[in-house]
Structure formats: C-alpha cells, structure tokens
C-alpha cells in the first residue's frame, strides 16, 4: 500500500500551473488556489477541477454551481498565497482586480487566461470533489509568462529575454 505522504512527495515533482478558482452566487463569493485542473475535451469545452471536501468554501461551490479558473502569471504569486491562506473570502478578493463574464464568477482581470464555467457534474473521490465544468466564456491576456508550482515552490515559465 502506498502511503499518502509518499504519494504527495511524488506529486510535488509534477510541475503544475497555478490557478485561483472562484465562485459567486447565492452562497456568496469564494475562492481557493488549485493546481489540480485539466482539460477534458474541447467539444464541448470542459475542464476538470478538484477541490478538497474539507475546504471551508467547498459547500459554497456546490451551491453556486459556477466557477472560474484563473490561470496565474508570474506577477500573481501574492494572489496565489492569499487564496491559499486562512484569510476570509472578502480579504482574499482585496488582492488583484476582479471582473465577471457570463456566470458572474470572479475573473482576475490580468490572469493569463480565465475560463468561466458552469459545474455540470460532481464526483466524490476519496477526500476530494471532482467538478466537471462546461466552459461558457474565456478571457485571455497578452501575457505569456506562467506561474508554475514545482517541488513545493513557485517557478516562472514562458518568454525570457537574453541580453
């Protein structure tokens, strides 16, 4: 049997994009930092988002049934940290400039790309909920430098200039 700590150690060596997942609706405005996000299909455009069921905002995502995936750029490390912290929801959204698209879920104005989604299906697997999310709107920036998490620290991926 594989121990959870061994699995987490191995997964720390898998480079992942850093995302802030947000929701807004009858249950309020909430968000969290996530790396467990991936494309499922482009027809219809669908993303998979994983969320720990013990997260204090978990019930709010279930009730609102919408979310946005905000892919962070290198300038967003402080936003990632805020949404991964114990700050209350209102304090988290004091970091960054926010707007909305079709669903009303908060969109980070200068994210690399934001996917505005409706949650179509939810599966429970172990400690996490897996949200299957239909993308209904996309906002893309001009930036091309991504914030990546690898080996328990942030890294930069993208355009570099050699002088």
What are these regions (language model features)?
Residues 1-163:
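Basic, polyanion-binding surface patches
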């Amino acid at each position: 049997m594989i121990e959870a700590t061994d699995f987490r150690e191995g997964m720390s060596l898998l480079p992942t994009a850093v995302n802030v997942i947000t929701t807004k609706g009858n249950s309020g405005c909430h968000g969290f930092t996530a790396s467990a996000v991936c494309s499922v299909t482009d027809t219809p455009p669908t993303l998979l988002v994983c969320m720990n069921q013990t997260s204090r905002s978990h019930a709010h995502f279930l009730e609102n049934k919408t979310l946005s995936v905000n892919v962070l750029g290198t300038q967003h490390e402080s936003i990632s940290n805020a949404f991964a912290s114990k700050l209350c929801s209102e304090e988290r959204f004091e970091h960054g400039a926010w707007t909305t698209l079709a669903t009303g879920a908060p969109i980070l104005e200068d994210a690399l790309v934001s996917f505005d989604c409706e949650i179509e299906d939810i599966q429970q697997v172990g400690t996490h909920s897996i949200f299957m999310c239909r993308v209904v709107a996309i906002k893309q920036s001009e930036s091309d430098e991504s914030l990546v998490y690898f080996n328990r620290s942030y890294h930069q991926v993208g355009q570099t200039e050699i002088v």
